[in-house]
From Swiss-Prot:
Record's protein name: Cytochrome P450 FAS1
EC number: 1.14.-.-
Subcellular location: Cytoplasm
Induction (free text): During the interaction with host plants.
Lineage: Bacteria, Bacillati, Actinomycetota, Actinomycetes, Mycobacteriales
Naturally occurring in which organism (per UniProt): Rhodococcoides fascians
Length: 399
């Protein structure tokens, strides 16, 4: 697996586990300074209770003050363009703007509303498994299964043409790649907005029953066109790679724990608890976006000056012994309540129900279809580390 020594501390992994250094920061210090971010002091926060407290307190820890779209060094992004990019960007908003948009979206992401997609998710998974089997072995689970399943589910929800899947996959990877330059990210952002703007225009002209059509009908009613473009982009960006990575990494983790893979196949009661445990244990989103301390605050005995940024480490927090016993052990029978893989508070992941539905279908299905599933002995497992979301370059499997 690829090394991560050159990455920020919160992104470094020892395989699928926190590095010893990150674990020590959590257990010994709780909070440490990590230089500057956006020209202000920054602090890494690692303990479960402290991270949860930050998520719960949007009055003292602001998302709106984080420059989510930095102007590239070339200086060719004008302020009007940045304003359009920021509009509707839920992760970069505080109440009341965040509350207004969240209220518009909440009903469409309820468990009841999303349950209508469950039969289609099962069809998508079965079809992808057929394709994987027909491809012959060894086969790349990410390319043949995890990425297409995740993307097609989102396309079904939103009304995005699946024919554009290669373009969508490529652009999502570029937007999440922290090794890309500011100019490269700006190019990807522009491409993304142009594409999403075309979809929104089409939905306004011929609104369907998908999420894009439903929301297009609400433009002008407390929702702007720029906001809808950003919302659809964020749903696609936030839901595609994260769910695909969770599928691939969950299968990898269970292959390393065959007795637990067997339990997930044989006992339906283990599926829900198992997915919750895998969400906690893997924490594919290394951290959440930095938040700015609006006033001076104390965290774990450390003074955080007003105007400083805090970086909440999801991986460290979800492996905290204050959350669960033996936190570094994978145990699909425990199903820990309260993990922070989807965040907490007003920014709790809007798509958590859809992600859970997809994972509860896709992960056990591949294990059932291929009971002799194994890592290909002729291929190394390579993690995609320099990304906001931990992923796999590929996962070559035999059966």
């Amino acid at each position: 697996m690829a090394g991560t020594a050159d990455l920020p501390l919160e992104m470094r992994r020892n395989g699928l586990n926190p590095t010893e250094e990150l674990a020590q920061v959590r257990d010994r210090d709780g909070v440490i300074p990590v230089g500057e971010l956006y020209g202000a002091p920054a602090f890494l926060v690692c303990r479960y209770e402290d991270v949860r407290r930050i998520f719960a307190d949007s009055n003292r820890f602001s998302n709106a003050h984080t420059p989510m779209f930095a102007i590239p060094s070339g200086g060719d992004v004008i302020e009007d363009e940045l304003a359009a990019m920021r509009a509707g960007n839920l992760i970069g908003l505080d109440p009341p703007d965040h509350t207004r948009l969240r209220h518009i979206l909440a009903a469409e992401f309820s468990v009841h509303r999303l349950s209508r997609l469950q039969p289609r998710i099962a069809e998508i998974v079965d079809s992808a498994l057929d394709g994987l089997e027909q491809a012959g072995q060894p086969a790349d689970l990410m390319d043949r299964y995890a990425l297409p399943v995740s993307l097609l589910v989102l396309c079904e929800l939103l009304g995005v043409p699946y024919a554009d899947r290669d373009e969508l996959r490529d652009r999502t990877a570029r937007l999440l790649d922290l090794s890309a330059s500011a100019e490269q990210r700006a190019v990807a952002q522009r491409e993304d907005r142009r594409y999403m703007a075309t979809l929104v225009t089409r939905a306004q002209e011929q609104p369907g029953d998908d999420l894009l059509g439903i929301l297009a009908r609400k433009i002008g009613d407390n929702l702007s066109t720029d906001e809808l473009i950003s919302i659809i982009s964020l749903i696609m960006l936030g839901g595609h790679e994260t769910t695909a990575s969770m599928i691939g990494l969950s299968v990898l983790a269970l292959l390393h724990h065959p007795e637990q893979a067997a339990m997930m196949i044989e006992d339906p009661n283990c599926v829900n608890s198992g997915i919750e445990e895998l969400l906690r244990w893997l924490s594919v989103a290394h951290s959440q976006p930095p938040r700015m301390a609006v006033t001076e605050v104390q965290i774990a005995g450390v003074t955080i000056p007003a105007g400083s940024f805090v970086i909440p480490s999801l991986l460290a927090a979800n492996r905290d012994s204050n959350l669960t016993d033996r936190p570094d052990d994978l145990d699909i029978t425990r199903g820990v309540a309260g993990h922070l893989a989807f965040g907490h508070g007003v920014h709790f992941c809007l798509g958590h129900s859809l992600a859970r539905m997809t994972l509860r279908t896709a992960v056990p299905a591949v294990l059932r279809r291929f009971p002799d599933l194994a890592l290909s002995p002729s291929h190394d497992v390579r993690l995609r580390s320099a990304s906001i979301v931990l992923g796999l370059e590929e996962l070559q499997l035999t059966w």
